[in-house]
Amino acid sequence: MSCSGSGADPEAAPASAASAPGPAPPVSAPAALPSSTAAENKASPAGTAGGPGAGAAAGGTGPLAARAGEPAERRGAAPVSAGGAAPPEGAISNGVYVLPSAANGDVKPVVSSTPLVDFLMQLEDYTPTIPDAVTGYYLNRAGFEASDPRIIRLISLAAQKFISDIANDALQHCKMKGTASGSSRSKSKDRKYTLTMEDLTPALSEYGINVKKPHYFT
């Protein structure tokens, strides 16, 4: 039985429709990864061979590669590790720790107080040449009130040392004056020197004290 030209095989129609050129069907988005796979990708580093993020980092794609190529200044500050502690306040770059009070200029030298303690104990049984009442009187006139007798005796010792140095300098000037005048021919161990104002004036000038010989009136 012959078939007319208008007739078509119903089974061949779908095949011809499939082979005919046409727009490509839209590609569906990949399904979301399971939670276990996402956890593995997050835990594995990008540089680990065979890790889930290795392909993305090697290919230059993905968030890990973008993070690696990001400039250092745009990255966040590196957090302090759990084992390390933040530098204390007052620490400087060379590793020397300075107290905050020392950084403000309140620098106090550390001196051993043992010799001073022994010296103060000796002052309790020492009687200076200048009486304590005299030293205390002039301290009160200067506006300083010392209740500790050891402080008064310490100031008395300082005054004695100052007067002794001036007297020794005046004596040296007197000896030099006697040597220059030629009176050193008669050498005697029992010779006594009389200090005058001419001997005291140059000795005091060395300490910044200027004195003048008083005028003599007849």
Curated annotation (Swiss-Prot):
Domain of life of the organism encoding this protein: Eukaryota
Protein family according to the UniProt entry: Belongs to the TAF10 family.
Record-linked PANTHER family: TRANSCRIPTION INITIATION FACTOR TFIID SUBUNIT 10 (PTHR21242:SF0)
Keyword terms, alphabetized: Acetylation, Methylation, Nucleus, Phosphoprotein, Transcription, Transcription regulation
Any one Gene Ontology BP term: embryonic placenta development
Main location: nucleus
Compositional bias of kind Gly residues: 48-62
Motif ([KR]-[STA]-K motif): 187-189
Stated name of the protein: Transcription initiation factor TFIID subunit 10
Post-translational modification: Monomethylated at Lys-189 by SETD7, leading to increased affinity for RNA polymerase II.
Modified residues (N6,N6,N6-trimethyllysine): K189
Self-association and partners: Component of the TFIID basal transcription factor complex, composed of TATA-box-binding protein TBP, and a number of TBP-associated factors (TAFs), including TAF1, TAF2, TAF3, TAF4, TAF5, TAF6, TAF7, TAF8, TAF9, TAF10, TAF11, TAF12 and TAF13. Component of the TATA-binding protein-free TAF complex (TFTC), the PCAF histone acetylase complex and the STAGA transcription coactivator-HAT complex. The PCAF complex consists at least of TADA2L/ADA2, TADA3L/ADA3, SUPT3H, TAF5L TAF6L, TAF9, TAF10, TAF12 and TRRAP.
PTM annotation (N-acetylserine): residues: S2
Compartments where located: Nucleus
GO cellular component: cytoplasm; male germ cell nucleus; nucleoplasm; nucleus; perinuclear region of cytoplasm; SAGA complex; transcription factor TFIID complex; transcription factor TFTC complex
Chain positions with Allysine modification: K189
Record PTM Phosphothreonine, positions in chain: T48
Residue positions, PTM Phosphoserine: S44
Region span, Disordered: 1-85
Protein species of origin: Homo sapiens
GO MF annotation terms: DNA binding; enzyme binding; identical protein binding; nuclear estrogen receptor binding; promoter-specific chromatin binding; RNA polymerase binding; RNA polymerase II general transcription initiation factor activity
Annotated function: The TFIID basal transcription factor complex plays a major role in the initiation of RNA polymerase II (Pol II)-dependent transcription. TFIID recognizes and binds promoters with or without a TATA box via its subunit TBP, a TATA-box-binding protein, and promotes assembly of the pre-initiation complex (PIC). The TFIID complex consists of TBP and TBP-associated factors (TAFs), including TAF1, TAF2, TAF3, TAF4, TAF5, TAF6, TAF7, TAF8, TAF9, TAF10, TAF11, TAF12 and TAF13.
Biased composition (Low complexity): 1-21, 29-39
Domains (record comment): The [KR]-[STA]-K motif is specifically recognized by the SETD7 methyltransferase.
